[in-house]
Amino acid sequence: MDDLLAPNQGDLEINWQNVGPQNEKGFDNENNYTTIAYNFPGDNTIEELGMSKETKDETVNSKIKWVAFKQQFFSSILIAGNDFQNATLQYETFAPGSGNIKQFHAQLSVPYTPQTDSYGFSFYFGPNKYSTLKKYDDLHLQRLWIIGWVNRWLVIPTFDFLGKYIANYGLIILLLTIFIKIIISPLTYKSYLSTAKMRLLKPEMDKINEKYPKQEDAMKKQQAMMALYKSAGVNPMGGCLPLLIQFPILIAMFRFFPASIELRGKSFLWADDLSSYDSILHLPFDIPFYGDHVSLFALLMAVSVFITSKISYSQTAQAGPQMAGMKFMMLYLMPLMLLFWFNNYSSGLSYYYLVSNIITMGQTFVFRYIVNEDKLHQRMKENARKPKKMSKFQQRYEELMKQREQLARQQAAARNKRK
């Protein structure tokens, strides 16, 4: 290269461009996964250009190891043998219907050394499959695949194990759902038991509400409620905490199905591609935020959400006008929002949530059968008669409540003096 470049040439500029074609049914969904990613040397994380509907560019003024033009299921990756010195990255988004998703640009530089005839680079053109990318662990390419600890240690191993013996991916999703529901069933049972206890306490809670109807008595009412919970051995947050613990699994499933190349092109029942939306009816018009088709899996999933929410609210102790808005949100608005959202999303994900909700309904009926609420109520009464030793947290909480009550009285007295 010495006869082509000046001796004082500092860097070699590499101008890499590519067009990301539309490979999947849904433009918007595929566009969400299409971007430019890069990795810093020695770093086990990756950086991505943020989402933009049109053009996005970024200048990186430090060394990077590789640059990837990433799409939903496939990536083109350029890997430097001795690192790129800096980079200017840009993508431009095509209009829907053009047949393409994004135009990629990467301007990269490597240090030029006179009398050097070759520079080491590697290309990866292949699927965004975790097991394949993991083979290049020293480059951390597997980070291109959307992952978390739940997917890494639970979902992917189970999915791969079932895939060795079962060819039907609809059946694999069914068995995966059953397996996960069995694992979290102790948490589900604990949540149901806590809800049942709160429901049995409702008559006493109603009496406390009647005793302290005024807003200025809110502190006394709260103290009375806490005393009731303590005497009965009930944790008012006991029904929520198990559900919060399950939240990482819900997020993992939400990220797993649309990004798994194993589901790409795999059919089940009326769905011809479990990685994309299913359609049983094409509409002659486009409904804003919904689309121009009807996804049956999304529709059935939304119905199952409504039914499970209905069952859940039928067994809660909460009532009153303050809960009316929450009830409307959970019973009606949430299923409708999910219907609009999932209509253009992975049919495999809608199918998973549908099966999960059906199993939840079955678990609820089983728990109702095995839990004798009369005996449970009797144990709660016996527990209330036993002397209770306050924990340090409860002592501090009670002291805090007394201080807040005293402060409220002082503020009320000050207001009365000013009148």
Short names for language-model regions:
Residues Y165, Y169, L228, A232-P236, ...:
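Loop-to-transmembrane-helix entry motif
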Residues Q222-Q223, A227-A271:
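Extracellular ectodomain/stalk regions of secreted and cell-surface proteins
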Residues L250-M326, L331-L338:
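Long, His/Glu/Asp-enriched segments that create or flank divalent metal/ion-associated functional microenvironments
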Residues Y189-N235, P284, A302-G348, V355-K419:
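Terminal, Lys/Arg-rich, intrinsically disordered segments and adjacent short helical elements
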Residues M1-Q142:
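Soluble non-transmembrane domains of integral membrane proteins
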Residues I147-E210, L241-I245, I249, F254:
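Core alpha-helical transmembrane segments of integral membrane proteins
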Residues L171-I180, P236, L243-F257, F297-I307, ...:
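Hydrophobic alpha-helical transmembrane segments of multi-pass integral membrane proteins
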